[in-house]
Amino acid sequence: MPSKLAISSMSLGRCFAGHSLDSKLDAAQRYGYLGIELFYEDLVDVAEHLSNERPSPEGPFVEAQIAAARHILQMCQARGLEVVCLQPFMHYDGLNDRAEHERRLEKLALWIELAHELHTDIIQIPANFLPANQVSDNLDLIVSDLCKVADIGAQALPPIRFAYESLCWSTRVDLWERCWDIVQRVDRPNFGICLDTFNILGRIYADPTSPSGRTPNAKEAVRKSIANLVSRVDVSKVFYVQVVDAERLSKPLLPGHPYYNPEQPARMSWSRNCRLFYGETEYGAYLPVKEVARALFHGIGFEGWVSLELFNRRMSEEGPEVPEELAMRGAISWAKLVQDLRIPVEGPLVTMPRVSASL
């Protein structure tokens, strides 16, 4: 099966900056994307506009969200786009507060209904990144929590799959190896992994607090990680992959840096501001994404959805040119990746020159 290009809906502009889902889907269609990861933020934004209702602190406005999901499906179908997944089902795994665990588990029923309305069978779960005092280090508890969602999803009609992803700043699961170990221990056919070049390399290769931008022994860490990935990962459990790069900062992300936020890990601040598309060296891209991508596409033989999950400060800027620019940059990076690695793909490739734009 050839690989298919997708992008996260918020990667084409944040709704709080005035970027409607309509405008972002239009841009995705124009530049040859075949699917989107629907960011929950965008679904809520559509629901608010359709119903003139806002979510209360006590809980979601359920009927408005279901109506929004139906509307979004129609929007996507009109543009020939599929919904790859609904994401992120956040801060669920390993909560110390078990009452909060139950409240979040109750929300899963709505997410499953939304997924059904969107005609997707995947809900993505990022590994918990709440403060350490809120997240257990008991791996058995984390596995048990994730078994629960997998079993609930398996009983849904149609069944729902879950893609678990380690983030490079997650509290307990910040390495793909640990994420993969958990997936194996959950041991459910509908529970798999999402492998993301940024989050893999952002943990073992990059260190935004270092003047070099790199961890000690970064190259050797990548070599070992790739060898482990190729030898250990069962590609049938990789539900989709994400391929992006990131910017090397001109100075360490420490107090006084424009992106420094004392309330979040440095890697999270870096991620939210500085991800780039593959090959964007003109913007400072420096991660060895090509090597990891080669392991994904040729080492384990991944085929299927490839999403460009960008987070970048450009997404929060206003102006109708933002979705257009980001969609074009992503499509050009995809064409470069396909050419560099000779990846069989479905759909056309963009060949126009890069757009000149500020970050």
From Swiss-Prot:
Reactions this protein catalyses: 3-dehydroshikimate = 3,4-dihydroxybenzoate + H2O
Induction pattern: Expression is induced in the presence of quinic acid. The quinic acid (qa) gene cluster is subject to two levels of gene control: a primary system which responds to the presence of quinic acid via the qa-1S repressor protein that blocks the qa-1F activator, and a secondary system which represses transcription of qa genes in the presence of a preferred carbon source such as glucose.
Keyword Transmembrane in annotation: no
GO terms, biological process: 3,4-dihydroxybenzoate biosynthetic process; quinate metabolic process
Coiled coil: none
Molecular function per GO: 3-dehydroshikimate dehydratase activity
InterPro entries per the UniProt record, alphabetical: IolE/XylAMocC-like, Xyl_isomerase-like_sf, Xyl_isomerase-like_TIM-brl
UniProt KW keywords: Lyase, Quinate metabolism
The EC number(s) this enzyme carries: 4.2.1.118
Pathway: Aromatic compound metabolism; 3,4-dihydroxybenzoate biosynthesis; 3,4-dihydroxybenzoate from 3-dehydroquinate: step 2/2
Keyword Lyase: yes
Regulation: Divalent cations such as Mg(2+), but also MO(2+), Mn(2+), Ba(2+), and Co(2+) activate the enzyme, whereas monovalent cations as K(+), Na(+), and NH4(+) decrease its activity slightly.
Subunit structure: Monomer.
Family from the record: Belongs to the bacterial two-domain DSD family.
Known function: 3-dehydroshikimate dehydratase; part of the qa gene cluster that mediates the catabolism of quinic acid (QA) and as such, allows the use of QA as a sole carbon source. Catalyzes the third reaction in the inducible quinic acid catabolic pathway by converting dehydroshikimate to protocatechuate. The qa cluster encodes 3 inducible enymes (qa-2, qa-3 and qa-4) catalyzing the first three reactions in the catabolism of quinic acid to protocatechuic acid (also known as 3,4-Dihydroxybenzoic acid).
Annotated protein name in UniProt: 3-dehydroshikimate dehydratase
Species: Neurospora crassa (strain ATCC 24698 / 74-OR23-1A / CBS 708.71 / DSM 1257 / FGSC 987)
